[in-house]
UniProtKB/Swiss-Prot annotation:
Biased composition (Polar residues): 1-16, 428-444
GO biological process: double-strand break repair; NLS-bearing protein import into nucleus; nuclear pore localization; poly(A)+ mRNA export from nucleus; positive regulation of DNA-templated transcription; post-transcriptional tethering of RNA polymerase II gene DNA at nuclear periphery; protein import into nucleus; protein localization to nuclear inner membrane
One of the record's GO molecular function terms: RNA binding
Entry-annotated residues carrying Phosphoserine: S273, S403, S404, S414, S667, S679, S689
The protein's name: Nucleoporin NUP145
Repeat (FG) residue spans along the chain: 12-13, 79-80, 106-107
Length: 1317
């Protein structure tokens, strides 16, 4: 690529342009394929004794063929050597040797057998007499089968004294006996790909491991490779059993800081990142070498990750069971494991001895835990204890037929999903271990990826069993899938605790489940079945109990709206944890602040998580409440492997090595081996020793128990209140009461963190108030009714005077039978400058009856006079509206004839004639005088003159032609039409021309207006235009009214109601009852909203539907009885003839809510509601008067008798047994009527009364009092017939003490009778 030659190399290998003269020789081993392999970084030929004409160089390595004869010089690749240049590599020194091959940046391209070349990158100069080959950055690509050679180390390697090839950065790809790579050697008999093995491929070196196919010659032995962390295989080293190695859990450094093991070449040491688990690809020792030492070495192999340093290019967690699937990229492990402190050596950036404290402390704490077996705890619970995430612990096969076929695939998929979760969690662990900077970087990356993740609804979702496995299951198996888990990477997961039915998603499990049925949102919520229509019942489908785990759930600062991930803020996390525990219907399980993992249990599915974003907000008030609750003892947070070590736990060394841990690891969760089973017998020997004041005397004990200072519930704390002087001590109780009162006011005050607004039934708004004591305030919204006269009671009285009110046929509620309401009545209360005055004035002109000062008996004359009067009023009103517009044009015009025409627009013929005479246009003054005469001859002559001008081609002034057109009586028809004036004048000006100069005698006023509207389109949102349209519609007024109401809001509710009622009662237009009631409902509601209850009640009387009128009037009176019974509005109820029963019932309801039961009964009696009055006496008034009665004066009982006497005799005969009990009881107490009939009536009625109303609190107490009175009367008289009534007396609703006393009296009477006998 950059080294062009005749036989130049390509980027990933050389392309030979010469034809080979010989074929590849047979390999020396049957395992070696006779082909030329090209690796990722160059050609790696393992063909021994091969004659290749053109050995090509790769990108990073060059081909070397030991014992081969090169026919032409080898051309180097991108970083390869050039022949005949004995110079060093990139940083290598020049060697004084006889060889002509130099080291390259990434290795040597040695084509000779015995030569001494310079070292590669970072290698020192070598002056070695023996044959030496140099190591490159990625190792040498040599096939030298010479055991006496010595190769120098690569980038970080040290020279070895053994006859082995030099190690590269990622290991050697050679066939020498022993190779030492940077991360260890892996010399096997099989080929290795970039990330693992690929059987059947050529023996080419991998990216991160060596793939040296060892082919020893005759007489040579094959060396074994070091696979343990120390670079040697101690299973092959003979040593005494007494020389036991140190414990694998002990520190690698002794007291003096020296390593127990000899330092090995760094190339030979394989390290593992934090995300790695137990290595699964460590080779086992040979069976023939089994010994104690070998077994210890096996343990070392299994735990080498916990003692290996965390290097830059340490491989991630290997998964050998995934059929060659690679792990996470190594660069991720490098950047996810930044060191907080790094002290490099002089010659290496890695420590040569010792190990990383982070790797030792946090690599995998599960290996340092003791094995505890508890049958009562499942493996899933233990897994949640360590990581907070669920995992599948067992696989329940749905059918025996697919157990042998699908089990391996299912296990692989399950492990894959779990490993992805573990790798991500371990990356988070490294973030928290390495400090805030790495946490910020990770959060930044997560934030950048969040937008991309949200773009795809199914991005990051996974489930177990996987969708592929589910597709292979039958419908019967899908109906009950156990251990189903579904989640989303970075969001959380759901573990269903019962079998789920997945038959509804057989169309596509991936499309139906991921992001459609199960939705994990970035708002820390999860939703299953977002569509309620498709949501099954509880217990079906996915709507079963489950355990939900949400990730990255942190408290949010209320001010900055940013999550608080600093775990040192214990107070904030405690408050946040308390909020999570108090979530309703989400049974809290655990919360891990390191990672923000929140686990909880739900019984069914809806939207779960932080549904309300304010639940995660933490402010100073929450922290102050936490502090006000008293100083709690500091609790040590139980941390997992994600916990961050403190600075005191870290000891850094300055000699180039990392410090080791000191002390005990606090992050290890200690579990007890067992928990003893306790029974009641275990507590028999334990004596309670309460520190309470007790006494054997019951009286003294009650005094002690009643004392607030010695209460067992009183909190014992020292007095720390303000006590600055003697006044505080003297009035401490008073100060405490004041403080308590302030505290109560503060607690009762509404202090919600959010703003709110709520409408009440009275059309009032309840809002938050930060000033008032209650924290809320009631506000009234502004009404649309802006007409002030509506708020005047005088206007309401005038309206009531103009209507006739009668009772309806089906109910006693009022109805307006006749009305003489006119638009002009409202004009008297309006200001002439208001915007509504012109509208109501026009309506009065068009719709109100016209009155004239004289009478006539001829109907035709009357109609003509009425028409003329209305026409005159209408044109006068229009002139007043267009006057300013025309006057402005007259002032701006200099043409006298044009000014004459403008005067005619104002129907001012006098001024127009005067101007015509002054301007020497006398003929025009004569013609103008005929305007408005409606003479047919004048109209014909004017029309004839216009035709002559048109046919003769005469040039005539347009203003003169306009005047002639007005004389013709059809200004907007025929020749010289004035429709072109539409762009110059308003539509009201043109309408005035039609009304003033049209054929008014031939047509009615409505028809004349309609003819003009047919020629011009009026603006639909102009209320004046709408009124003209309604006036011209005549018979179709209601239809046009509905269309206008649907199209525009030009007419307000009040005007529409007034228009309909005026036209309906005057008989000028016809409106249906439905249209009238619709307008009445709307106007009455608007008046009620404006607190004009009297006006609303008056308008409601216009309703035609009797049932609707009854409901509306009743609701209004019952709700607003207080305002309607006020002194200013009391006459309205009488004038509107509201039923008295409704008024008194409404007042009684008000008294009941206020607790005035006596007034309630009195109002019910006044309203003749005897049934309601009887119920009120039985349940409320009677028991209360009896319980509050003074036995001496009996005033309350006398009041009760007066109330009962107000019932008419016809109603007294209908009394129930319950109210009759009070009447008989009053006779017994007030009148001393103690006859047997009275007592029997009381006893029998008392039982019925009690059984029927015992749910009322006052009734039970009242019956007890009356029963005691009955028993006392009987016992005082010593009635001889008492023996017959003993059973009945004991059935009275007496208390237990009273019944016991009564039984005792009966027993004494029995003993007396026996003694006498």
């Amino acid at each position: 690529m950059f080294n062009k030659s005749v036989n130049s190399g390509f980027t990933f290998g050389n392309q030979n342009t010469s034809t080979p003269t010989s074929t590849p020789a047979q390999p020396s081993s049957s395992l070696q394929f006779p082909q030329k392999s090209t690796g990722l970084f160059g050609n790696v030929n393992v063909n021994a004794n091969t004659s290749t004409p053109s050995p090509s160089g790769g990108l990073f390595n060059a081909n070397s063929n030991a014992n081969s004869i090169s026919q032409q010089p080898a051309n180097n690749s991108l970083f390869g050597n050039k022949p005949a240049q004995p110079s060093g590599g990139l940083f290598g020194a020049t060697n004084n040797t006889t060889s002509k091959s130099a080291g390259s940046l990434f290795g040597n391209n040695n084509a000779t057998a015995n030569s001494t070349g310079s070292t590669g990158l970072f290698s020192g100069s070598n002056n070695i007499a023996s044959s030496t080959q140099n190591g490159g950055l990625f190792g040498n690509s040599n096939n030298n089968n010479i055991t006496s050679t010595t190769q120098n180390g690569g980038l970080f390697g040290k020279p070895t004294t053994t006859p082995a090839g030099a190690g590269g950065l990622f290991g050697n790809s050679s066939s020498t006996n022993s190779t030492t790579g940077l991360f260890g050697s892996n010399n096997t008999q099989s080929s290795t790909g970039i990330f693992g093995q690929k059987p059947g491929a050529s023996t080419t070196g991998g990216l991160f491991g060596n793939n040296g196919a060892s082919f020893p010659r005759s007489g040579e032995t094959t060396g074994t490779m070091s696979t343990n962390p120390y670079g040697i295989n101690i299973s092959n080293v003979p040593m005494a059993v007494a020389d036991m190695p140190r414990s694998i859990t002990s520190s690698l450094s002794d007291v003096n800081g020296k390593s127990d093991a000899e330092p090995k070449p760094i190339e030979n040491r394989r390290t593992y990142s934090f995300s790695s688990s137990v290595s699964g690809n460590a080779p086992l020792p040979l069976a023939s070498q089994s010994s104690l030492v070998s077994r210890l070495s096996t343990r070392l192999k299994a735990t080498q990750k916990s003692t290996s340093p965390n290097e830059i290019f340490s491989p991630s967690y290997s998964k050998p069971w995934l059929n060659g699937a690679g792990s996470a990229p190594l660069v991720d492990d490098f950047f996810s494991s930044k060191m907080t402190s790094l002290a490099p050596n002089e010659n290496s950036i890695f420590p040569q001895n010792g190990f990383n404290f982070l790797s030792s402390q946090r690599a995998d704490l599960t290996e340092l835990r003791k094995l505890k077996i508890d049958s009562n705890r499942s493996a899933a619970k233990k897994l949640k204890l360590l990581s907070g995430t669920p995992a599948i612990t067992k696989k329940h096969m749905q059918d025996e037929q697919d157990s042998s076929e699908n089990e391996p695939i299912a296990n692989a998929d399950s492990v894959t999903n779990i490993d992805r979760k573990e790798n991500r969690d371990n990356n988070l662990d490294n973030t928290y271990l390495n400090g805030k900077e790495q946490s910020n970087n990770l959060n930044k990356q997560d934030g950048e990826n969040t937008l991309q993740h949200e773009k795809s609804s199914s991005f990051g979702y996974w489930c177990s069993p996987s969708p592929e496995q589910l597709e292979r299951l039958s419908l019967k198996q899908l109906a009950a899938v156990s251990n189903f888990v579904i989640g989303r990477r970075g969001y959380g997961c759901i573990t269903f605790q019962h079998d789920v039915d997945l038959t509804a998603f057989t169309k596509s499990f991936r499309e139906e489940l991921f992001g459609k049925i199960v939705i994990f949102r970035s708002s820390k919520t999860v939703e299953v079945y977002p569509d309620e229509a498709t949501k099954p019942m509880i217990g079906h489908g996915l709507n079963v109990p489950a355990i939900i785990t949400l990730e990255n759930v942190y408290p949010v600062d209320k001010k900055t709206k940013k999550p608080m991930k600093d775990t040192t803020k214990f107070a904030e996390f405690q408050v946040f944890d308390r909020k999570l525990r108090s979530m309703r219907e989400m049974n809290y399980i655990s919360y891990n602040p390191f990672g923000g993992t929140w686990t909880f249990k739900v019984n069914h599915f809806s939207i779960w998580g932080l549904v309300n974003e304010e639940d995660a907000e933490i402010d100073e008030d929450d922290l102050s409440k936490q502090e006000d609750g008293g100083e709690q003892p500091l609790r040590k947070v139980r941390t997992l492997a994600q916990s961050k070590p403190s600075d005191k736990e870290v000891i850094l060394k300055t000699d180039g090595t990392f410090g080791t841990l000191s002390g005990k690891d606090d992050s290890i969760v200690e579990e007890k081996a067992y928990e003893p089973d306790l029974s009641d017998a275990d507590f028999e020997g334990i004596e309670a020793s309460p520190k309470l004041d007790v006494s054997k005397d019951w009286v003294e004990q009650l005094i002690l128990a009643g004392s607030s200072l010695r209460s067992v519930f009183a909190t014992s704390k020292e007095f720390d209140g303000p006590c600055q002087n003697e006044i505080d001590l003297l009035f401490s109780e008073c100060n405490d009461e004041i403080d308590n009162a302030k505290l109560i006011m503060k607690e009762r005050r509404f202090t919600a963190s959010y703003t709110f607004a709520k409408f009440s039934t009275g059309s009032m708004l309840l809002t938050k108030d930060i000033v008032g004591k209650s924290g809320v305030s009631i506000k009234r919204l502004p009404t649309e009714l802006q007409r002030k006269f509506l708020f005047d009671d005088v206007y309401l009285d005038k309206e009531i005077e103009k209507v006739t009110i009668e009772a309806r046929k089906s109910n006693p509620y009022p109805q307006i039978s006749e009305s003489s309401l006119l638009f002009k009545d409202a004009l008297d209360y309006m200001e002439k400058t208001s915007s509504d005055y012109n509208l109501w004035k026009l309506s009065s002109i068009l719709f109100d009856p016209v009155s004239y000062p004289y009478k006539t008996d001829n109907d035709q004359v009357k109609m003509a006079l009425l028409k003329k009067e209305r026409h005159c009023r209408l044109t006068s009103w229009i002139v007043s509206q267009i006057g300013p517009e025309i006057e402005e044009k007259i002032r701006n015009s200099s043409n006298e004839i044009e000014q004459i025409f403008l005067y005619l627009l104002l129907n001012d013929v006098v001024r127009a004639s005067k101007l015509a005479i002054e301007s020497k246009n006398g003929h025009l003054s004569v013609l103008i005088s005929y305007l408005g005469s409606n003479d047919p001859r004048i109209r014909d002559l004017a029309e004839l003159q216009l035709q002559k001008w048109s046919t003769g081609g005469c040039s005539i002034d347009k203003n003169i032609s306009k005047i002639y057109k007005l004389l013709s009586g059809s200004p907007f028809e025929g020749l010289f039409s004035l429709k072109e004036l539409e762009s110059e004048f308003s539509w009201l000006c043109l309408l005035n021309l039609t009304l003033c100069y049209g054929q008014i005698d031939e047509y009615s006023l409505e028809s004349l207006v309609q003819s003009h509207l047919d020629k011009f389109s009026l603006p639909y949102d102009d209320p004046i235009g709408v009124i003209f349209q309604l006036y011209a519609a005549n018979e179709n007024t209601e239809k046009l009214y509905k269309e206008v109401r649907q199209r525009t809001n030009a007419l307000d509710v009040q005007f529409c109601w007034y228009l309909i009622q005026t036209l309906r009662f005057n008989g000028t237009r016809v409106f249906s009852k439905e249209t009238s009631d619709e307008a009445t409902f709307a106007f009455a509601a608007q008046l009620e909203f404006a607190q004009l209850h009297g006006h609303s009640l008056f308008v409601s009387c216009f309703l035609n539907d009797d049932k609707a009128a009854e409901d509306t009037i009743k609701r209004l009176v019952m709700r607003e009885i207080t305002l309607l019974r006020a002194s200013t509005n009391d006459h309205i109820l009488n004038r509107l003839k509201i039923p008295s029963q409704l008024i008194f019932n409404a007042q009684a309801l008000k008294d009941r809510y206020e607790g005035n039961y006596l007034s309630e009964v009195q109002n019910l009696l006044l309203g003749s509601s005897y049934d309601l009055a009887e119920m009120a006496i039985v349940t409320s008034l009677g028991p209360r008067l009896l319980l509050s009665n003074n036995p001496v004066q009996n005033n309350e009982l006398k009041t009760l008798r007066e109330i009962l006497n107000e019932f008419p005799d016809s109603e007294r005969d209908k009394w129930s047994v319950s109210i009759n009990v009070f009447e008989v009881y009053l006779k017994l107490v007030l009148d001393n009527v103690e006859t047997q009939e009275t007592i029997d009536s009381l006893i029998s009625g008392m039982k019925i009364f009690y059984d029927q109303y015992k749910h009322c609190r006052e009734v039970a107490a009242c019956c007890n009092v009356m029963s005691q009175e009955i028993v006392s009367k009987i016992l005082e008289k010593n009635n001889p017939s008492i023996g017959d009534s003993k059973a009945k007396l004991l059935e009275l609703p007496l208390g237990q003490p009273e019944k016991a006393y009564l039984r005792g009296e009966f027993a004494q009477d029995l003993m007396k009778c026996t003694y006498k006998i």
